[in-house]
């Protein structure tokens, strides 16, 4: 795993508290499952009908019938349960998921999220993201701060089709952590070795800076 991804995943793990029901989105968020510390008991949910996902299996121990929503092989923890999609989405839409950690393509300064398609490119579909951003109690997004062309993915307004409006509570990038309250974006943490000036330079969105960052 790249060092930048490791930093984001390890920071995302800090969002998980003992006793939570948590959904991990497809892609980088699924790596969080391997980093949950001993003694923190959570139930990880997948939209395809499993509550109680464990870490990725070791090579040679994979069960091809045991997969997550991204079709990756997984393990299960003691007490895991299986159910159909109707029950899975009833959990999500009914507000029974405490935290969803999702990937992102773009996030706006008001907390809008675009994470499901790029026009003109083949996509599998929306999946459960739209349900999660409206049903889960808390939404944390993890993504790289800029795209492969060096353009900011933290935007004034999202240019890609939205998954949800004003749904993001916290954004974790390889540069910084931002919180969203009442449509206002605030820089609350810097990743190691990153300066406020670098964040300004690589962020299209307008944002405030918390006193704790200014004092650090």
Swiss-Prot record:
Keywords: Transferase
Catalytic residues as annotated in Swiss-Prot or TrEMBL: 47
Record bears the keyword Transferase: yes
Catalytic activity, EC: 2.8.3.5
SUPFAM superfamilies found in the cross-reference section: NagB/RpiA/CoA transferase-like
Reaction equations catalysed: a 3-oxo acid + succinyl-CoA = a 3-oxoacyl-CoA + succinate
GO molecular function per UniProt: CoA-transferase activity; succinyl-CoA:3-oxo-acid CoA-transferase activity
SMART domains given in the database record: CoA_trans (SM00882)
Record carries keyword Mitochondrion: no
Domain of life of the organism encoding this protein: Bacteria
Pfam families recorded: CoA_trans
Classification via PANTHER family: KETOACID-COENZYME A TRANSFERASE, SUCCINYL-COA:3-KETOACID COENZYME A TRANSFERASE SUBUNIT B-RELATED
Subunit structure: Heterodimer of a subunit A and a subunit B.
Family: Belongs to the 3-oxoacid CoA-transferase subunit B family.
Protein name, UniProt field: Probable succinyl-CoA:3-ketoacid coenzyme A transferase subunit B
């Amino acid at each position: 795993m790249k060092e930048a991804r490791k930093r984001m995943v390890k920071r995302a793990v800090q969002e998980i508290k003992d006793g939570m029901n948590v959904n991990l989105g497809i892609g980088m968020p699924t790596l969080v499952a391997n980093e949950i510390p001993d003694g923190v008991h959570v139930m990880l949910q997948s939209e395809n009908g499993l509550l109680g996902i464990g870490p990725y299996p070791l090579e040679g121990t994979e069960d091809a019938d045991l997969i997550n929503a991204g079709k990756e092989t997984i393990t299960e923890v003691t007490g895991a349960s299986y159910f159909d999609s109707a029950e899975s989405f009833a959990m999500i839409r009914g507000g029974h998921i405490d935290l969803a950690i999702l990937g992102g393509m773009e996030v706006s300064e008001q907390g809008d999220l675009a994470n499901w398609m790029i026009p003109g490119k083949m996509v599998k579909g929306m999946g459960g993201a739209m349900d999660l951003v409206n049903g889960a109690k808390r939404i944390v997004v993890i993504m790289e701060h800029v795209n492969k062309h060096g353009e900011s993915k933290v935007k004034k307004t999202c240019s890609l089709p939205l998954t949800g409006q004003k749904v993001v509570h916290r954004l974790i990038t390889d540069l910084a952590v931002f919180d969203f309250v009442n449509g206002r974006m605030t820089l609350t943490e810097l990743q190691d070795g990153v300066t406020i000036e670098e964040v300004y330079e690589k962020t299209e969105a307008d944002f405030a800076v918390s006193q704790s960052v200014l004092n650090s």
